[in-house]
Amino acid sequence: MNQTRVFLIFAWLMVAALLWMEWGKDKAAANAPTPIASQAVPAARDPDAAAPAANVPSAQAIPQAGSPAAVPGTSTTTATATPVAAGAAPAITLTSDVLRLKLDGRSVLDAELLQFPQTKDGTEPVKLLTEDAAHPYNATSGWASERSPVPGVGGFRAEQPGTTFELAKGQNTLVVPFVWNGPNGVSIRRIFTLQRGSYAISIKDEVINKSDAAWNGYVFRKLSRVPTILSRGMTNPDSFSFNGATWYSPQEGYERRAFKDYMDDGGLNRQITGGWVALLQHHFFTAWIPQKDQASLYVLAQDGPRDVAELRGPAFTVAPGQSASTEARLWVGPKLVSLLAKEDVKGLDRVVDYSRFSIMAIIGQGLFWVLSHLHSFLHNWGWAIIGLVLLLRLALYPLSAAQYKSGAKMRRFQPRLAQLKERYGDDRQKYQQATMELFKKEKINPMGGCLPLLIQMPIFFALYWVLVESVELRQAPWLGWIQDLTARDPYFILPVLNIAIMWATQKLTPTPGMDPMQAKMMQFMPLVFGVMMAFMPAGLVLYWVVNGGLGLLIQWWMIRQHGEKPSKIIQANAK
């Protein structure tokens, strides 16, 4: 099978996949399920003050700290809703070198990523968590109980005076303690810790019982969001990157649920020890990461228009004069592979969603590993992309050679195949039998060009998603006119080069026996794909240009290696 057919098959598959995604979005919009009924979104500032949504386990099903609980059922009993505390404390702002958080001690209401501007030339940072009225997105850690007092919305108060706390120059850690003082001597001390250069926020709670009775309750950690409506389009990576909830357990591995069909498979009610739960979008995500040795009930639910991903538990019984503690990390930030690795959380690297399938994700991770090492040497993501394509082409050269060798052998026997077709006329059975005998006699494998293609396809599909999903490439320049690899080429130079390379490759490709109508259609393919790619991210088009250019050189070399003349092929295709 020749190089152009390899390219065109891959391109057709890409277009088919993109069209399928578009159709899926339209179908989902037309047949969107009515959200599961639950309590209305409360008017209070903290959106999670309401009781949990219906069809979730009872408080008794929450795993107890330090003891394995049975996997819960689906009782609809819920814990008592937590009221807004009288005289709620004002919101507090915490600022590190990478994060600016607005919180009330219970919920992170607003989060800005200070090192990620919304636009290439802008100064406004990406806002991941937000109090936006239309599309609120919050992270909450609270306590619930059916019998004992717990903090209400706004119940936590900063121990230190002031409403603004900032990581000072020369400091590596910002520690801000909060406290809730309940009735009868029960208190909960909460400590927020931010580290320089990190998007992981440590939240540690200590329940101190100085009352005369046992205190019972469980901690819950929740991500709640009204998903934004993304502008649809095949050239907009935001619209076909995965947007939804993901979670990980040591037993089941990585799983996910898209916002558009959030409750199609019902709510998630599963007890997991360790693991994590996250809400993903293109380039960024939020996640709750509990302690590895503590069990939680993982829940997916809907609360009115909000999609909720929640961890419930562990539950604690704190005797008089005793205390108990629990800790978790809240990630609010980009999908930076280097920083995710520092968290040392199993499976967290899967939030860089190269694929929902493990084998494709492994291929993508391997390709990014090579790409990042090339970047550490070249210090430019554009040149790193070019270097990666060069390495892939070198590694896959034996397969390309096998493809062309198989195709060249088939072309040499085209006259004999034509004779067989003329001899047997419309008797297809005899024609096929004679053809197979010829293949067997001459040791021709008609599928010889397909096997190398099947091996190459997963690699190039994975590379496509690596370039789409890697936040490291976001707003990264290459050279000259390409100042953002995730934006389209402003002068369409790369798309024009891509059209020229595809046209030249097509002219250099032998097409014996091709139907005249098919041949005419093929002549328009470079223009069709060139126009389609004109509005795609420049990094992707750069990949296509380099890959196509190398393919053209390999095609020329293969033709000469097998005793064929490029000029004759070009003349034959011009007829």
UniProtKB/Swiss-Prot annotation:
BP-aspect Gene Ontology terms: protein insertion into membrane; protein transport
Highest rank taxon of the organism: Bacteria
Pfam families cross-referenced by the UniProt entry: 60KD_IMP (PF02096), YidC_periplas (PF14849)
Membrane topology, from the record: Multi-pass membrane protein
Keyword Chaperone assigned: yes
Keywords for this protein: Cell inner membrane, Cell membrane, Chaperone, Membrane, Protein transport, Transmembrane, Transmembrane helix, Transport
InterPro entries referenced in this protein's UniProt entry, alphabetically: Membr_insert_YidC, Membr_insert_YidC_N, YidC/ALB3/OXA1/COX18, YidC/Oxa/ALB_C, YidC_ALB_C, YidC_periplasmic_sf
TM helices/strands, residue ranges: 6-26, 357-377, 381-401, 448-468, 490-510, 526-546
Family indicated by similarity: Belongs to the OXA1/ALB3/YidC family. Type 1 subfamily.
Subunit (UniProt): Interacts with the Sec translocase complex via SecD. Specifically interacts with transmembrane segments of nascent integral membrane proteins during membrane integration.
NCBIfam families hit by this protein: PRK01318.1-3 (NF002352), yidC_nterm (TIGR03593), yidC_oxa1_cterm (TIGR03592)
Protein name: Membrane protein insertase YidC
Provenance organism: Xanthomonas campestris pv. campestris (strain B100)
